[in-house]
């Protein structure tokens, strides 16, 4: 919905990880595993070397999720999530009607160890709903996770970071995604967040003021802007859970319509506050001019910060070399000059 906002938020997340853990993230994992070729291009320009995405059947086709793939036109390695093995824990662990119930750590690791020849890794991913919402503490979910490392050691199954997987990747097959995909529901698309008119209207009205918000200096407006973009706000407006899909949630609202009304009331107040600072009478051309000025200033700030960093590191900024000045002729005393003149005229 807004490329500039997306990039700004990704940069803030990266900076937060660096400040907390001292590591620069190189593999991207988007909210709800939302991904597309276009998103892949954005994050590649931001310095990421890989991305996690859903191993959706309509994207993979006959291909296996247990391989790495390449983005079609930028240098980005793709790591698909193994949907079945992930959902075995996230959604089936507590399902008494499942034919593999109960799921034990040794059974699960045996499945992992039985991968086909050539399949060197498996991405297993789930959200925190697997711990406490989908699977309560009395289901044994915590004991299951505690036992996994030991069972993995017995079967000589190792754990790897995404960056380690990418470093060992040898597969150059391309994986293309046209429309954005996610890990939600059977469709694996974005319909859980923008699949009905309620969600569409809320999203349109929110991002219609994105340029004005970027010009604001009010910290309260900036903070509320981020909260209003949280995906759960639109997830609660979904009507898909009436059909019994996994979109069913334990949200704070009785219905999607109540979620919509509450959100729009808050958004209306927010839009009024933004309008007080940057009225809608200011046309987009003027706003774009202001944003261009701000972006140029930000670029200059970055350049100055880099120069300061070099100075702190003991490196002087490069200066243009000056051409050495021509030596000045020495002036001789007048008396000697006169004598010399006499000698040259004497015969």
Regions found by a protein language model. Give the residues of each.
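The substrate-binding groove and active-site-proximal loops of carbohydrate-active enzymes
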Residues: 1-6, 23-31, 89-104, 132-139
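CE4/NodB-like, metal-dependent polysaccharide N-deacetylase domain
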Residues: 3-32, 111-125
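Acidic, His- and aromatic-enriched active-site or binding-groove loops in soluble protein domains
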Residues: 3-11, 23, 44-83
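Generic structural signal for well-ordered alpha-helices
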Residues: 7-14, 40, 109-112, 145-149, ...
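Short, solvent-exposed turn/loop segments enriched in Gly/Ser/Thr/Pro and often Arg
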Residues: 29-35, 56, 165-166
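Substrate-binding cleft/loops of secretory-pathway carbohydrate-active enzymes
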Residues: 38-48, 63-66, 169-178
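Active-site and substrate-binding clefts of carbohydrate-active enzymes
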Residues: 67, 72-76, 80, 95-96, ...
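Intrinsically disordered, polybasic Lys/Arg-rich low-complexity tracts
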Residues: 313-347
